[in-house]
Amino acid sequence: MASLRKTHPLLKIANHALVDLPAPLNISAWWNFGSLLGLCLASQIVTGLFLAMHYTSDISTAFSSVTHICRDVNYGWMIRNMHANGASFFFICIYLHIGRGLYYGSYLYKETWNIGVILFLLTMMTAFVGYVLPWGQMSFWGATVITNLLSAVPYAGEALVQWIWGGFSVDNATLTRFFAFHFLLPFVVLAATLLHLLFLHETGSNNPAGLNSDADKVPFHPYFSYKDLLGFAILLLALTSFALFAPNLLGDPDNFIPANPLVTPPHIKPEWYFLFAYAILRSIPNKLGGVLALLFSILVLMLVPLLHTSKMRGSTYRPLTQLLFWALVADVLILTWIGGMPVEAPYIVIGQLASLIYFSIFLAFLPLAGLLENQALK
């Protein structure tokens, strides 16, 4: 008689995804980040749910309700620190996951890749509306600056901004709806994650060699389930250490000041994980141009599968592409640094150069390197 996990309508799905899934034998630790992102999402939903039980989405009480959570709620400080730093770890895992996909050519699974990019955009939206909720100075001014970007939309811009604000400025209506969105979006992310997995399991995982691995697969459990558990332990250790020892290291000190529409902070900047895109936005002097560059800095990922010219899949045996990949990594780090700097003398031109290099690598250098390497193979 067949096991229940193979016959039960629900357990059968879980079995095919987590137990009997054929996985390539040679996938490295770079393939751990998908499951780590699942762990981050679960952790964020659980901690977020407990925070939502005590948070009030009203401008007169939002800031003090967060203070109340940290002071008066049992382990409230811990839940809040886990949630705030959990977002940072979420994005660290996302960037490593995307980097792995770019390096090893996983983007050639087009449906999986494109849903991944949509997931990335959804996660960015979720993090943005979440950052507004504590109603500190940076929350308020960040919301004002970023929502204002929509005014660059021709003809409908002004109406669009006021529609999102629910008035003529960022006010109570804005905070209330942002809380509603922040509660809803993680579940949309969860649904999109299931689609991401569904499409991945249609093809199976890629591997470091970039070759077909049908002849050499092992069951996901116990091999990769235990490998993932090790990753879970490392991530949770790092996250709890951060939440306990350096909870405010990645935050902005300005957010400890309650929101004041009459006082603008000296440097308005988003959380560290958005700085690279913020730098690209600022490097273009035209408002609409900047907004388009900001959008395209993420959407350019959708073009990567279309611009793949090489006969080989991954970068494992392609030295030129490897060089460009690491140049891209360095470039994103430079953009992240520039995004946190004031708009003045050396930083402006560095940001513009780094933005130009960012798009050039994606749109020109990588496809050209692929063609060159094809020639070298002949």
UniProtKB/Swiss-Prot annotation:
Q: Which cofactor does it need?
A: heme b
Which cysteine residues pair off into disulfide bonds?
none
Q: Which Gene3D superfamilies does the UniProt entry name for this protein? A: Cytochrome Bc1 Complex, Chain C (1.20.810.10)
Q: Give binding positions for heme b b562.
A: 83, 182
Q: Which molecular function terms from Gene Ontology are attached?
A: metal ion binding; ubiquinol-cytochrome-c reductase activity
Q: Which residues bind a ubiquinone?
A: 201
The biological processes this protein is annotated with in GO are: mitochondrial electron transport, ubiquinol to cytochrome c
Compartments reported by the entry: Mitochondrion inner membrane
The record's listing under PROSITE patterns reads: CYTB_CTER (PS51003), CYTB_NTER (PS51002)
Q: Where are the transmembrane segments?
A: 33-53, 77-98, 113-133, 178-198, 226-246, 288-308, 320-340, 347-367
Q: Show the CDD domains listed in the entry.
A: cytochrome_b_C (cd00290), Cytochrome_b_N (cd00284)
The protein's superkingdom reads Eukaryota
Annotated Gene Ontology cellular component terms: mitochondrial inner membrane; respiratory chain complex III
Q: Tell me how the cofactor is bound.
A: Binds 2 heme b groups non-covalently.
Which residues bind heme b b566 per the record?
Answer: 97, 196
* Membrane protein topology class: Multi-pass membrane protein
- Which residues does UniProt call coiled coil? none
Q: Write the record's keywords in alphabetical order, separated by commas.
A: Electron transport, Heme, Iron, Membrane, Metal-binding, Mitochondrion, Mitochondrion inner membrane, Respiratory chain, Transmembrane, Transmembrane helix, Transport, Ubiquinone
UniProt family annotation = Belongs to the cytochrome b family.
Q: What is the protein's quaternary organization?
A: The cytochrome bc1 complex contains 3 respiratory subunits (MT-CYB, CYC1 and UQCRFS1), 2 core proteins (UQCRC1 and UQCRC2) and probably 6 low-molecular weight proteins.
Q: What else is known?
A: Heme 1 (or BL or b562) is low-potential and absorbs at about 562 nm, and heme 2 (or BH or b566) is high-potential and absorbs at about 566 nm.
What is the role of the protein in this entry?
Answer: Component of the ubiquinol-cytochrome c reductase complex (complex III or cytochrome b-c1 complex) that is part of the mitochondrial respiratory chain. The b-c1 complex mediates electron transfer from ubiquinol to cytochrome c. Contributes to the generation of a proton gradient across the mitochondrial membrane that is then used for ATP synthesis.
Q: What is this protein called?
A: Cytochrome b
